[in-house]
Amino acid sequence: MKELIISLLLWIGAETNYNVDLAHPEIKMMSQTALEHKFYGHKKPANGTLHAFYDPKTDIIYLNENFDRFNAFHKGVLLHELLHYVQDLNDVVGKKFQCMRETELEVYPLQKKYLLEVHGVVFEYDELYVLLQANCNPNMF
């Protein structure tokens, strides 16, 4: 996992202006049920679509225990969360973005670029959904 994190951080450094000379984040693997409970708590029913998340309060990346470091999609998921970690440690919230949710507007296109350029995988995502999720006032809709 260490080598994968190093290679992903190097890619992030080459594609962005962020400082990536950072301590590696702690990675915790957990079951799908535990992952969703940790992220959603009791607020939302689990639906099995959460792959991972970054907790900016603890600087921990939580991954599904079925993470496969040889799977391109899984590498893209880890890249996505590492981007949030790098953004957080580069203090982009309040400078480049109004809130942490808004950082998704940068992360999804970079994840798409990484998967296509490095793995030849076309990653499609719903840009409108991401735009809505990136809203700093989630109760607006």
Regions found by a protein language model. Name each.
Residues T49, L89-N90, M100-T103:
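Acidic/His-rich structured neighborhood in mature extracellular/periplasmic domains
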Residues L4, L8, H74, L78, ...:
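Stable alpha-helical elements in mature extracytoplasmic
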Residues M1-I61, N71, E117:
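Auxiliary, metal-adjacent structural segments of Zn-dependent hydrolase domains
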Residues G76-L89:
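Active-site recognition of the HExxH zinc-binding catalytic motif
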Residues R69-N71, L83-V86, K96-F97:
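Mature extracytoplasmic domains of secretory-pathway proteins
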Residues L63-N64, Q87-Q98:
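Substrate-binding clefts and substrate-entry loops adjacent to catalytic sites
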Residues F97-L132:
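Post-HExxH zinc-binding segment in Zn-dependent metallohydrolases
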Residues Y62-L78:
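Short pre-active-site segment immediately N-terminal to the catalytic Zn-binding motif
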